Amino acid sequence: MDYKNLVAERIKENTELEVDLIEKLIEIPPKKEMGDYAFPCFQLAKTFRKAPNLIAEELKEKINKEGFEKVVTVGPYLNFFVDKTILIKDVLEKVLSEKEKYGSSKVGEGKNVVVEYSSPNIAKPFHIGHLFTTAIGNALYKILSFEGYNCIGINHLGDWGTQFGKLISAYRRWVDEEALEKDAIGELLRIYVKFHEEAEKDPELEKEARLNFKRLEEGSEEETELWNRFKDLSLKEFNKVYDMLGIKFDSLAGESFYSDKMDAVVQEIDDKGLLVDSNGAKVVMLDEYNMPPCMIKKSDGATIYATRDLAAAIYRKKTYDFHKCIYVVGTPQALHFKQVFTTLKLMGHDWADDCKHVGFGLVKLANKKLSTRNGDVVFLEDLLNQSVEETLKIINEKNPNLKNKEDVAKKLGIGAVVFTYLKNNRERDIVFDWKEILSFDGETGPYVEYSYARGKSILRKAGELTGEADYSKLSSKEEFELAKLLGGFNDAIMNAIDKLEPAIVTRYVIEVAKAFNKFYNAHGILNAEDNDVKLARVKLVEATCQVIKNALNLLGIDVVEEM
């Protein structure tokens, strides 16, 4: 039963307010002893021509209280206490019947959502900063899909630009083919850095690089072949990381894909009378929006990121007719996206309002002990491997006889890293600390995973229990609080969609794990006082495990059945 909706329906019966508005006004009281839901009566003061506290008193007398333990007033608020037995029964039966679908809905049915995320640069390291966009984007993709949206995940690869002219020059001069086969990204990075060092002494190199890129733009066979090789080698490396994370994309259309679509966009901007000359460059003036001009073409005639993003947005709208187009890109790019979306609006594309920038913070290291292959760049693959190794050490200390411990270490180690990236508000910076990330105490991935594994261990020991559960036997505070939390899973998901914030689901599953451990520590389960209590508690454990598994899956994290 949706108690929030029930509260809204009961209030609607006695007021002229619509259910949707009432649901938006309903609050969760700050203290549990004040009730489960609270409705503020301020909105009714004009209609009833009375003080809100008097309205609350009147409604309390009139309202149908079926399904609620009691309804009380707290000043101008009408507070509802749900019937605990009914809630527990409703929630557990729903979880156990819907299983892996519990928490899902069809709210997004028939709506396409484009999610652009990850988007590393070809021939550059896939470093620890890239996991922020990758983890957030993957979680949003999964969360939105779970609620019925048809998601299109796009890896907008950085595979075009003058840097490829430089890389071609560097490759022809300094590449070590053996090193390239062993560590493609490392070798491409080495020669790219060397190009910049040498170009400071010899400016002719820059001219040569520009000529290389011009040839590439014109489709020259030799330059195109090299560019494709850089791309293939890079994707081979990137896919190692994506495989570790269990991530697949629906499209790899990167910057190069839009190279033949930009002239039409520039022409459209010009036709609308928006293109202005600024010191030889072509820009769209955005003064009235308190923004600097959006550069469309540089003074040398080259297009830049904004032009490509405009072309990409227009292409995606035509191809996918999206309900929303989400860009998971760092917060420093906020101005860039405001300029792009505003330019789209000025071009007459009102759907620009459906384009959303999802920003995120930076990744910092608590210490410098993370080994690096090249200077201060920490490769993501190395980080994930190191996390798996550290986790395996912990397992060998705590449970050396665990079956499949390498597989468990892989799931736990990678999951712990992803969980860390998704734990807090996405715009907050992350301070990376192994001790905290891999801890089995506190608000960490391993703590939630351990709670799940503990529950699964209880279920294995309980075996097959027959008979129908009597949920009235679950009468304690800990049992009610846990069941009530399980009932709030869909609310957490919908809130995450509304705010485009996966951390809401992460925080939710942490709270479920905490509530489960409180219940576990307060009550005997397998040694309960009688079989009826035992069966009801085992069902509560089963439902808890299901919700933890569903929540972690939405975050892109695999569960471990035993540890």
From Swiss-Prot:
A motif ('HIGH' region) lies at residues 120-130. The keyword Protein biosynthesis applies. It is found in: Cytoplasm. Coiled coil: none annotated. One of its GO terms (cellular component) is cytoplasm. GO terms for biological process: arginyl-tRNA aminoacylation. The keyword Ligase applies. It catalyses: tRNA(Arg) + L-arginine + ATP = L-arginyl-tRNA(Arg) + AMP + diphosphate. Its main location: cytoplasm. Keywords: Aminoacyl-tRNA synthetase, ATP-binding, Cytoplasm, Ligase, Nucleotide-binding, Protein biosynthesis. GO terms for molecular function: arginine-tRNA ligase activity; ATP binding. Its EC number is 6.1.1.19. Monomer. PANTHER family: ARGININE--TRNA LIGASE, CYTOPLASMIC, ARGINYL-TRNA SYNTHETASE. Belongs to the class-I aminoacyl-tRNA synthetase family. This is Arginine--tRNA ligase. It comes from Clostridium botulinum (strain 657 / Type Ba4). The lineage of its organism: Bacteria, Bacillati, Bacillota, Clostridia, Eubacteriales.
